[in-house]
UniProtKB/Swiss-Prot annotation:
Component of the ubiquinol-cytochrome c reductase complex (complex III or cytochrome b-c1 complex) that is part of the mitochondrial respiratory chain. The b-c1 complex mediates electron transfer from ubiquinol to cytochrome c. Contributes to the generation of a proton gradient across the mitochondrial membrane that is then used for ATP synthesis. The lineage of its organism: Eukaryota, Metazoa, Chordata, Craniata, Vertebrata. This is Cytochrome b. Its cofactor is heme b. It is found in: Mitochondrion inner membrane. Belongs to the cytochrome b family. Keywords: Electron transport, Heme, Iron, Membrane, Metal-binding, Mitochondrion, Mitochondrion inner membrane, Respiratory chain, Transmembrane, Transmembrane helix, Transport, Ubiquinone. Heme b b562 binds at residues 84, 183.
Length: 380
């Protein structure tokens, strides 16, 4: 019998082992679709971004008008830009749901996979931040000024670091040029990290919704999960195109339709919606360095998840107390997101501070205690 080329060819063999003959648990639900959805998001963003970069000029005098030119005069330029801007929102929706799934089902116990995932999140956040500066509108400019300025809170080297990042004494042409270079580079870094993420995942195999070893009951990835993933692609690309075609500016800030002006500060400086939870935590501490540390901790706390797991069961499927805590955490994140979009005044200040305390308390204290308590209740 002739050897099957997909199993013998050096390159096709790798694709085969990752996407065709990969043994997958038979009971993984739609929550396991978000990994492939993130892959589609990345491909869409790289493709639309490449097309946009062909018409973009990274210069403070031309950036804003080059984006306007793309939308007005380039064939389907408006659509490409709308897909790219809203694609970022869908990227973050998918990654937050993907992390939430990992948290709920104890997937963080695959430490290497989880850690590379958190690094991917940080890289994605950096990419989105530098990308938001490129249109050079008011919110782009002031967002860049405020966030880069946070580095000045670092003792001793802070101010030098900020001026080095800016390429001068304020956010100006050198800043825009380097941010464009970084925004072009980072997605390819994300693609590389994704391959590492998948390599680690395929070492252990997927977790499942029962949180138990499923080696005795595996099915081939193709055709079962390829079809399931394609359905997922359709269900994500439909709302993305709907948003891009019908309400492209729904998630944007009206302030960004005004060209950047260093002499006029917008009344409310705020980032895109997907950073608001972290922004609320930053603002909740009335000290610059403290705020910066809390901001960093709000994401870096994910690295601690494997060490804070005290339950004998892996998933939360049969742990109602942890489930309750998990959904309180989700609600808390929604509150933080809402507070981050509001002005700094009463009652939003105190709500933000309480929500920030709750966020860290649940993750660092209540989850381990509840896990240990459930062990006791189940006589483990």
């Amino acid at each position: 019998m002739a050897p099957n080329i997909r199993k013998s060819h050096p390159l096709l063999k790798m694709v085969n082992n990752s996407l065709i003959d990969l043994p997958a648990p038979s009971n993984i639900s739609a929550w396991w679709n978000f990994g492939s959805l993130l892959g589609i998001c990345l491909l869409t963003q790289i493709l639309t971004g490449l097309l946009l970069a062909m018409h973009y000029t990274a210069d403070t005098t031309l950036a804003f008008s080059s984006v306007a030119h793309t939308c007005r005069n380039v064939q389907y330029g408006w659509l490409i830009r709308n897909l790219h801007a809203n694609g970022a929102s869908f990227f973050f929706i998918c990654i937050y749901l993907h992390i939430g799934r990992g948290f709920y089902y104890g997937s963080y116990l695959y430490k290497e996979t989880w850690n590379t995932g958190v690094i991917l999140l940080l890289t994605l956040m950096a990419t989105a931040f530098v990308g938001y500066v490129l249109p050079w509108g008011q919110m782009s400019f002031w967002g860049a000024t405020v966030i880069t300025n946070l580095f000045s809170a670092i003792p001793y080297i802070g101010q030098t670091l900020v001026e080095w990042a800016w390429g001068g004494f304020s956010v100006d042409n050198p800043t825009l040029t380097r941010f464009f270079a970084l925004h072009f580079l980072l997605p390819f870094m994300i693609a590389g990290l994704t391959l590492i993420h998948l390599t680690f995942l395929h070492e252990s195999g997927s977790n499942n919704s029962l949180g138990i070893v499923s080696n005795c009951d595996k099915i081939p990835f193709h055709p079962y999960f390829t079809l399931k993933d394609i359905l997922g692609f359709m269900l994500m690309l439909l709302p993305l195109t709907t948003l891009a075609l019908f309400s492209p500016n729904l998630l944007g800030d009206p302030e960004n339709f005004t060209p950047a002006n260093p002499l006029v500060t917008p009344p409310h400086i705020k980032p895109e919606w997907y950073f608001l939870f972290a922004y609320a935590i930053l603002r909740s501490i009335p000290n610059k360095l403290g705020g910066v540390l809390a901001l960093a901790a709000s994401v870096l706390v994910l690295f601690l998840a494997p060490f804070l797991h005290k339950a004998k069961q892996r998933a939360m499927t049969f742990r109602p107390l942890s489930q309750l805590l998990f959904w309180i955490l989700v609600a808390n994140l929604f509150i933080l997101t809402w507070v981050g979009s509001q002005p700094v005044e009463h009652p939003f200040i105190i709500i933000g501070q309480l929500a920030s305390i709750t966020y860290f308390t649940i993750l660092l204290i209540l989850f381990p205690i509840t896990g240990a308590l459930e062990n006791k209740m189940l006589n483990y």
